[in-house]
Amino acid sequence: MERVRDVSELPKAHLHLHFTGSMRPTTLLELADKHGVRLPETLTEALGRGESPKLRATDERGWFRFQRLYDAARSCLQTPEDIQRLVREAAEEDLRDGSGWLEIQVDPTSYAPRLGGLIPALEIILDAVETTVRDTGIGMRVLVAANRMKHPLDARTLARLAVRYAERGVVGFGLSNDERRGMARDFDRAFAIARDGGLLSAPHGGELTGPASVRDCLDDLEADRIGHGVRAAEDPRLLKRLADRQVTCEVCPASNVALGVYEKPEDVPLRRLFEAGVPMALGADDPLLFGSRLAAQYEIAREHHGFTDAELAELARQSVRGSAAPEEVKGKLLAGVDDWLVA
């Protein structure tokens, strides 16, 4: 009988974790009380029961409800101390799940009004990351993400800012929010600015919309990675293209089910992507709202898709290779994966 190893001890990289969505439920409730923020009852009741709220974002009404909960949680982050707490706790949760490298995704414009402006907000976040790296030992960097529901000119401003802070811990540029709003090509100039500044291109695509949105990310934004990308499984030619170019898809199985992209964990096409040779980096997306963190995604691959420990190890390797980690860090993590397999 094959030995079943603990996936929380498997060294890995975490490439798809949103800033506010990384918060512990207990932290959210404490910060809401601290700042006098009244959270939606659906959120407080679910978290009070130790559950995640019931979500489904496959239509605009469902997405609006999801965004409302997310915005309410974000409103509880009001001081540099709140930011530091969130970043440190996100790192602690990742370390507990075996992550040695975390790229946390944030749109600093969302925090600017409470933190003194756009530049102070990003600097506070980067300072928190630097302190957390020093205190915990985790490798951690920031991916700055534009909001596709805002004007493309805003994205260009954000891209320039991201490049300016590339030496302070920004490693990539993304595009998030509802894929059904705004065309990828509208943001091509922002991504060109980011690429010219040496940042990874990691836009969202292939989650709420089909394979066409993944193609748009490749064609218009020259994506190095795709946030989600799971709907590429519906197009064999696109799968081959992703595999040939070794574009990493940041697949978030629990999130896909929670938002109604797929009905059940076994419906998420992990096996199809894996066998097509598409690199994947499993991610937790928004644990606050979806109720599961990084190691749980590997458990889904094992329990619902029959991934062996050797295959789980390869998933971990793919996450490391797809990261912006320095080669020395990648080498250490990859060696750790090999050790996990022979232990």
From Swiss-Prot:
Site description Important for catalytic activity, residues in chain: 228
Keywords: Hydrolase, Metal-binding, Nucleotide metabolism, Zinc
Highest rank taxon of the organism: Bacteria
Xref: CDD domains: ADA (cd01320)
Positions annotated to bind substrate: 18, 286
SUPFAM superfamilies, per the entry: Metallo-dependent hydrolases
The record's free-text note on cofactor binding: Binds 1 zinc ion per subunit.
Enzyme class: hydrolase
Record-annotated active site: 207 (proton donor)
Residues binding Zn(2+): 16, 18, 204, 285
Gene3D superfamilies, sorted: Metal-dependent hydrolases
GO terms classed as biological process: nucleotide metabolic process; purine ribonucleoside monophosphate biosynthetic process
Required cofactor names: Zn(2+)
GO molecular function: deaminase activity; hydrolase activity, acting on carbon-nitrogen (but not peptide) bonds, in cyclic amidines; metal ion binding
EC number: 3.5.4.-
Listed NCBIfam families: aden_deam (TIGR01430), PRK09358.1-5 (NF006849)
Function: Putative nucleoside deaminase. May catalyze the hydrolytic deamination of adenosine or some similar substrate and play a role in purine metabolism.
PANTHER family referenced in this protein's UniProt entry, alphabetically: ADENINE DEAMINASE
Homology family: Belongs to the metallo-dependent hydrolases superfamily. Adenosine and AMP deaminases family.
Name under which the protein is recorded: Putative adenosine/adenine deaminase
Organism of provenance: Streptomyces coelicolor (strain ATCC BAA-471 / A3(2) / M145)
Organism taxonomic ancestry: Bacteria, Bacillati, Actinomycetota, Actinomycetes, Kitasatosporales
